[in-house]
Amino acid sequence: MDLKIFREYDIRGEYPTQIDEEVAYTIGRSYGSYIQEKLNRKICGVGRDNRLSSPSLAKELIRGITESGCDVIDFGLVTTPMYFFGCLKANVIIGIMVTASHNPKDDNGFKFSVDHLGNARGKQVYDFKDYTLAGNFLSGNGNVSEFDPRDYYKSFINIRFIIYDLI
């Protein structure tokens, strides 16, 4: 695993030279184990953006998380704000979004949270990196359920615009 993928605010690199399905699976195994051991959590949300590599990366990420014994709520293809909204609506406080944000189309990666709804940063990312490199992952059989937050998100946004128009 190329250690340069662990950055200040996320895990990101060029696909498939730095980030590939094997890396996604390992990140999933690590994340599922990490949230159980360090955060006492057994469920997380997962979303993905529209990059061509995102579906296969999300599939392997989810497989890794569930094989660590965690349950996953799969939000499918969503924007990052929809992913965060999905976490709120599904009542999960942590998760991973498969995205490279504003980076070039050949990049991909993972934005993740560890202690609240929001991106891990700094020491949180580096602690997760150390945990991942140690490789002491839990094993289990988590379940996957699907939740589509898009209609809820659109309604939420529409209400905001209606209220704004009334002011």
Where are these regions (language model features)?
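An N-terminal, well-structured beta->alpha segment
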Residues: 1-63, 67-68, 143-167
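Short C-terminal domain-edge/linker segments immediately following a structured domain
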Residues: 37-38, 75-78, 126-132
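Gly/Ser/Thr-enriched, mixed-charge loops and adjacent short helices
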Residues: 108-167
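Ferredoxin-reductase
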Residues: 39-116
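Residue-level signal for pocket-adjacent positions within structured domains
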Residues: 1-9, 105-107, 115, 139
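Glycine-rich loops and low-complexity Gly/Arg-rich segments
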Residues: 30-32, 69-72, 97-100, 120-124, ...
